Each structure stands twice: as C-alpha cells, then as structure tokens.
A protein has these predicted regions:
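Short catalytic micro-motifs in class I SAM-dependent methyltransferases
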Residues: 119-123
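A short glycine-rich, Lys/Arg-flanked "PGG" loop and its adjoining helix->strand segment in the class I
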Residues: 130-142
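Short, glycine-/aromatic-enriched active-site segment of Class I SAM-dependent methyltransferases
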Residues: 148-170
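Short alpha-helix
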Residues: 171-187
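A C-terminal cap/extension of S-adenosyl-L-methionine-dependent methyltransferases
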Residues: 192-248
Length: 248
C-alpha cells in the first residue's frame, strides 16, 4: 500500500483543501449513515456497528456525535500519528485500530452493519484492490451496506492522471465501470451511485454566463466552492464518485 506524504492538516491547522474534503466528501458519508439508520430502524439503543476505513483521527465520528448520529464506531488507519491525536479516542463507543487493510483486518467477519471510506482506494495499488474489497465484503453482516468515495476515471474519459498526482500519494484511479463489475463479482449489489467532488479532476464546470445556477454559486461562494458544489449535485461524471453497495 502506498502511503501519501501529502498532508492536508499539520499540527491542527486546517487547510482550505481539507475543509472542502470534510464538507463535500465526509458530509456525504455521514448522511448515508443517517439514511441507513432510518431505513433499518436503528436508534441510540440499537446502534449500527460502523467501520470507517482510512479514518484519519476519527473525526467523522466526532462530527456525527455533534449531529446526534450515534453508532458503535471502529476506525481503521495505517498512520499511528493520526490515531494518537483522536478527539474520540476515550469514548466507550469507539475502537481505533492501526492496521493496513491490504494485509487484512482483525475485525470479526460479519460484524459490521455499515462500512464507509473516503479518499482511500486511490492510495491502494491496483493489484491489491480486489483483496481489499473482498475484505470489506467479509466484514459486513448480511444486509449491511458499504459506501466508498474516491477519485476515478471512466472507460470513456480520463479525469485523473497518475503522473500529475504522485505528490498526493495516488497510485490508482479505479475505472467506474470496472469497479462496479469488480464489486458485483465479489458479491456486492450496487444500491446507488452519485457524482462527487474531486480535487484534481479535469472535469469542467459551466463557463460563467452559461448556467444561472452555477453563476449564482460562483457569485456567492467563489470559484473553488462553487466548483465543489456543482460536482456534488450534477448527474454528469465528474472524476469523483460515491459508490454505495449492499450485501444482500
């Protein structure tokens, strides 16, 4: 597994890039947890067992508690320094594990109701990706759900170039069609797919003056935030995506 030397946060000082990632990627995943809770009837007394792969310091759990979304949370990250500064490490409903998913996970098979992961799979070498997705499938309960987000390409268009993103630690951009096929061959069933924000994508937003909604977003939020919002709400492929699968 390739470990990125790129840091969006240094000593607690958040960058603008990191804030965009939290708002437009991790917020999506948190909302999917909320939706799953409602669908399955989970409450604070009947909590979802949630695994987050590439959890950084467990901040998604921290954000969820602020939104009154309570789960039994297991966060996995390969970098011990991140876990050492977790804001949720002392919570009784939190388990933090420093493990490399390409070498397997110590979590019991069939123990998790839901798995989420954002901006992780592009750091995993392509030959290791099938094994990683098989591991995630095995950890899910029957009826469980997996939601993963990452920068991607399609068979028709290359949104990302590895040579241009080596500095971010990226080693693989899964192809949309191939990734769905891979996961379905493992046993997953695609629940839905949504386009999403991706930092280095070659996706082009509408030219100013061509779309009133985009113009309004740009006038009020500025170009970077308008671009991120647009990539999140469009039905076009953007070079970033959220894949949600069920284990039926």
């Amino acid at each position: 597994m390739s470990h990125s030397q790129y840091k969006c946060q240094v000593q607690g000082k958040e960058s603008y890039i990191d804030n965009q990632f939290v708002i437009f990627s991790q917020s999506y995943l948190m909302n999917q947890v909320h939706i799953y809770n409602k669908e399955k009837g989970h409450t604070t007394k009947n909590r979802v067992n949630l695994l987050e792969l590439g959890c950084y310091n467990g901040r998604v759990m921290h954000f969820m508690t602020q939104q009154m979304i309570f789960v039994n949370y297991t966060g996995v990250d390969v970098t011990p320094q991140y876990l050492a500064h977790s804001p949720v490490a002392r919570r009784k409903d939190v388990t933090l594990l420093c493990e490399d998913v390409t070498k397997g996970l110590s979590i019991a098979d069939g123990s998790q109701d839901m798995i989420i992961s954002s901006e992780v799979l592009e750091h995993i070498n392509p030959e290791e990706l099938p094994g990683v997705m098989r591991t995630l499938y095995d950890k899910l309960k029957k009826g469980g759900r997996c939601c993963v987000a990452f920068p991607m390409n399609t068979r028709d268009k290359m949104f990302h170039n590895l040579e241009k993103e080596k500095g971010l630690g990226h080693v693989n951009f899964p192809v949309y069609e191939d990734f769905i096929e891979l996961c379905e061959n493992i046993g997953f069933t695609l629940h839905h797919y949504d386009s999403g924000f991706s930092l280095k994508s070659s996706f082009r937003t509408p030219r100013y003056g061509k779309d009133p909604l985009y113009d309004k977003l740009r006038d009020r939020l500025g170009s970077p935030a308008a671009r991120a919002v647009w990539m999140t709400i469009t039905d076009e492929h953007t070079g970033g995506g959220y894949f949600t699968f069920d284990k039926l």
